[in-house]
A protein has these predicted regions:
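N-terminal pre-domain segments of enzymes
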Residues: 19-43
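Catalytic grooves of carbohydrate-active enzymes
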Residues: 192-207, 211, 215-247, 482-500, ...
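Carbohydrate-binding surfaces of carbohydrate-active enzymes
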Residues: 27, 44-47, 51, 61-62, ...
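N-terminal signal peptide c-region/cleavage motif recognized by signal peptidases
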Residues: 13-17
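Long, well-ordered hydrophobic secondary-structure segments characteristic of membrane-embedded
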Residues: 64-68, 73-76, 83
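Acidic/aromatic-lined carbohydrate-recognition and catalytic surfaces
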Residues: 80-201, 205-209, 214-234
Length: 731
């Protein structure tokens, strides 16, 4: 009997530990997709962001879930809000949440749980401040900046939290360590002007907007956890996720899809730090970073020496590794172990220079996140902006083998979109690889002065949600097919290289306007994460890159360089735009060697400079962006690096955007006309298929269209209205 029971339990364990279909890459046939896409499973959304505010009760949630369902929502992202009749994370709250999940289940809706009572994620409704203050976020700061001149002694006391005291020469940036004796310094500078900087560690948090904060403001009264400390994240999971598991764990992987995080970052004046940082830094880099800290904490505008810039890049390299391993990975692992997915978006996705300071490295942070995301707020995506940043989330999914990438859309939009503009904003993201949609904002009807976002009141809105549901499902099926990789120059940005950032953003635009489907990859992907083949790099999703483009970068690792060389030797195309990197790093960036011409003799290099692309704005711009003028040398080099593009037009059109996916027996092409003019072009697409079909996402109708085929391509006429999408299936 014991043997039988053990066998049954083993089978049950195997079944429950297996990934659900929506959690893994699926390769159905086009016929199988056609059978399902008219009414896709609820796991593919869309979902509103729902705030449990005010005197919320069972009557309220039933009414609100019914409204969501009638609009066409198939899932809901739910956050504990303000003014609830029970305390957040209390037994009463979890009893109510159990009821909420049961009501969603009755309606065959799925639930994503917001992991905190506001944002950024990681304060557990104030519990770190109240109960675990030693696990709060910490930083290194300049506690004192003392001017000093030759011959005048600097005498002062320093606090017990002092890490280092360093004098910095005002003329050349050289530094001198200052000895601390009995919590005091006594130092006389040599000639010239100096600043003595006292570096301390302190508990310092990014501001949090918590619905448990009685002041209803975004401030530092409820501290975030120490993101760099796995023990702090373990405590966070105990405060939050484990309690949900006790209350509703039987619905994990069934009604409950996973946990949703929001903008974890270091929006602080100082350097991200944790007590284990220096030991970890020495383990990774092999040297002591403390002598350089004061240079990093100089007043705004201070110029760092080349050596200091390199050491600072090492600091942010280690910071980003510790952020990934201390915060994102434990949550992704916990969700996977509990049959769930972790979805999260960061801050500053559209401003990578800022992101490298606050979060380190986008793709590194997202490596173990099952559903990487972005958010689009303010005026970031509109008909008068250039916004390719959603491709970051899709690329993280593609590189690391996850089927979906999500968007939080429409929060704090200026102006608020109507239904037509909402469709445009979502289509801009679909064609860049996003395939799971969360919309802002649906407050509980118990919320004082509650009102849904205005576009939700439009009679045309349910039709848009039907469209979104089908598009999300269709673009989640199969695998990505991008054959071009664009390098994200985070390590150059760690050294303050704004030119590399600007070139990266404009190269995104260049490729998009030339209908070149691409993924974004980082140094870690090139150095080790991608599977190297003969003239190809393969992602965990199965798409293979035949070309890698590196835009105007100043730094590259030796490991990435070596693998790029082997890739090119096998027939892959490697293209440097503008310049080749001047530095090649090994274990450290501090000791990076100077690059030589022979390092890149095997690669293509296109001289010239791309014009900057405007950053997606917070407010409507005074005028739309001007047309992108690409230097001839760069345009020709890109064409040579991508000799067999997925899509070729008989006449160029920079308004057309495309993305390609691969089903078991068919190619999927999504076209989006982002321009205000109708488009009529003969289009040639790569495919071994013989039959071309147009799939109408709004009506679910499928019609065969006239096409001719030759040598692995299909040619057809493409006619599109302004701001229209077209789905082409070739099988």
């Amino acid at each position: 009997m014991r043997i039988v029971v053990a066998g049954v339990m083993a089978i049950v364990s195997t079944l429950t530990s297996a990934q659900q279909p929506w959690q893994k890459i699926q390769m159905p046939t086009a016929a199988q997709v056609a059978q399902i896409w008219k009414a896709p499973p609820p796991e593919y959304g869309p979902e509103p962001y729902y705030g449990l505010n005010g005197t919320v009760d069972e009557t309220v949630i039933r009414r609100d879930l019914d409204t969501m369902k009638s609009l066409g929502y198939q899932a809901v992202t739910v956050q504990a809000g303000y003014g609830m009749p029970f305390a957040y994370l209390s037994p009463e709250y979890f009893r109510f949440f159990r009821t909420f999940v049961e009501e969603a289940k009755k309606r065959n809706m799925r639930v994503w749980i917001v992991d905190d009572a506001g944002y950024p994620s990681g304060f557990a409704g104030g519990k770190f401040t109240e109960q675990k203050p030693k696990l709060r976020m910490q930083a290194l700061t300049a506690a004192q900046r003392i001017p000093a001149t030759a011959g005048e002694s600097v005498k002062t006391t320093v606090g017990p939290d002092t890490i280092a005291v360093t004098a910095i020469n005002a003329d050349d940036g050289t530094t001198v360590p200052v000895t601390v004796t009995n919590n005091a310094i006594d130092w006389t500078p040599p000639g010239g002007g100096w600043t003595v900087i006292v570096v301390e560690h302190e508990f310092k948090t990014s501001p949090t907007r918590s619905d448990t904060n009685p002041k209803r403001v975004k401030d530092g009264t409820q501290s975030l956890e120490d993101y760099l400390n796995p023990a702090a994240t373990k405590q966070y999971l105990e405060f939050t996720h484990e309690q949900y598991k006790k209350a509703v764990g039987d619905e994990f992987g069934r009604t409950i899809m996973g946990f949703r995080g929001d903008e974890p970052d270091y929006s602080i004046n100082g350097l991200p730090w944790t007590p284990e940082f220096f030991d970890r830094f020495t383990e990774i880099k092999g040297y002591d970073i403390k002598p350089y800290l004061a240079a990093f904490l100089q007043a705004r505008g201070a110029k760092l020496t080349d050596q200091q810039l390199r050491a600072k890049a090492d600091y942010y390299d280690v910071f980003s590794q510790m952020f990934r391993d201390g915060f994102f990975k434990p949550q992704g692992d916990w969700c996977a172990a509990n049959h769930l997915e972790y979805q999260v978006h960061l801050n500053h996705e559209e401003m990578e220079m800022d992101l490298t300071r606050s979060e380190g490295e986008f793709l590194r942070d997202m490596q173990y996140v099952q559903v990487p995301g972005i958010d689009t707020i303010w005026h970031q995506i509109w008909k008068d902006t250039i916004s390719d940043f959603p491709r970051l989330a899709a690329s993280a999914s593609h590189v690391y083998g996850h089927p979906r990438a999500f968007t939080e859309s429409f929060a704090a939009y200026r102006p608020a979109p109507d239904v037509d503009m909402a469709r445009y904003i979502l289509n801009e993201q679909f064609v860049r690889g996003v395939n799971l949609v969360e919309t802002m904002y649906f407050p509980a009807t118990s919320t004082p002065d509650a009102h849904k976002s205005s576009y939700m009141e439009d009679p045309a809105y349910p039709a848009l949600l039907t469209y979104v549901q089908r598009m999300s499902y269709l673009m989640s099926m199969g695998r990505p097919a991008a054959s071009v990789a664009l390098y994200l120059p985070s390590s150059s940005m760690w050294m303050g290289d704004a030119a590399a950032d600007a070139a990266f953003v404009t190269t995104e635009r260049l490729l998009s306007e030339r209908q070149i489907d691409f993924d974004i990859v980082n140094d870690g992907a090139l150095a080790k994460d991608l599977t190297a083949g003969h003239g190809a790099f393969e992602t965990a999703s199965g798409n293979r890159y035949a070309a890698v483009i590196l835009p105007d970068i100043s730094l590259l690792s030796q490991a990435a360089l070596d693998r790029l060389h082997a890739f090119a030797s096998g027939g892959g195309h490697v293209l440097f735009l503008g310049r080749t990197p001047s530095l090649i790093s090994g274990k450290t960036i501090l000791d990076a060697r100077s690059a030589t011409a022979s390092d890149f003799s095997w690669a293509s290099v296109a001289p010239g400079e791309l014009p900057p692309t405007p950053t997606p704005p917070a407010q409507p711009p005074a005028s739309p962006p001007t047309a992108l003028v690409v230097p001839d040398a760069i345009a020709q080099a890109v064409s040579a690096a991508v000799p067999l593009p997925d899509v070729t037009l008989d006449t160029s059109d920079t308004a057309l955007r495309i993305i390609r996916r691969r089903l078991k027996d068919a190619d999927v092409y999504l076209f989006f006309n982002e321009g205000p003019e109708a488009l009529s072009r003969a289009v040639t697409v790569r495919s071994e298929g013989k039959t071309a079909e147009l799939w109408d996402v709004q009506t679910a109708k499928i019609v065969t269209t006239k096409a001719t085929g030759e040598k692995g391509t299909i040619r057809m006429q493409l006619d599109m209205k302004p701001y229209e999408t077209t789905v082409l299936i070739v099988r």
